[in-house]
Amino acid sequence: FKASLDNSFRLVFFIAIPSLIGLIYFAEPIIASLFYRGEFSEFDVIKSSYSLVFFCYGLPFFMLMKVLTPAFFSRQDTKTPFYVALFSLFLNAILNYIFAFKLGYGHAGLAIGSSLAVLASSCILFFVLMKQNLLSLSIIFHKTNFAAIFSSLIMFLAFDYFVGIDS
């Protein structure tokens, strides 16, 4: 079980890190190619790309939730993910209110709040599994994760060199 969980973590990071980097750097062109026509203006593209970028920061944690939650279910523990999800729901509502309305980030604030809430809930589930000796912090510092970061950096530098992207 522990080996399967470790492999799942490595796979999540291997997929999430390059996706995160790519989506952040290409947020505007992606939004423009999908929606920039008709009533959707350049201003809308820029504002929508902010939301995409802030959701991207939560991408690894959204993906980790798909690994962490079934890890509890497979051990017949449905209460822990339930209580963490309930906490995350309230935290998400509070953070969305703070970022969207009090700090004035608008729709991008909703993305920030959602990303921070999923970060908190995935960290809680991760540390509960760590306490049960099913995970260790060493999985975060695995060489696969560094390879994903390095390959993402190479990808960005190659696009920057060949396409001339402003960074």
List where the protein language model places each region.
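Membrane-embedded alpha-helical bundles of multi-pass transporters/translocases
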Residues: 1-167
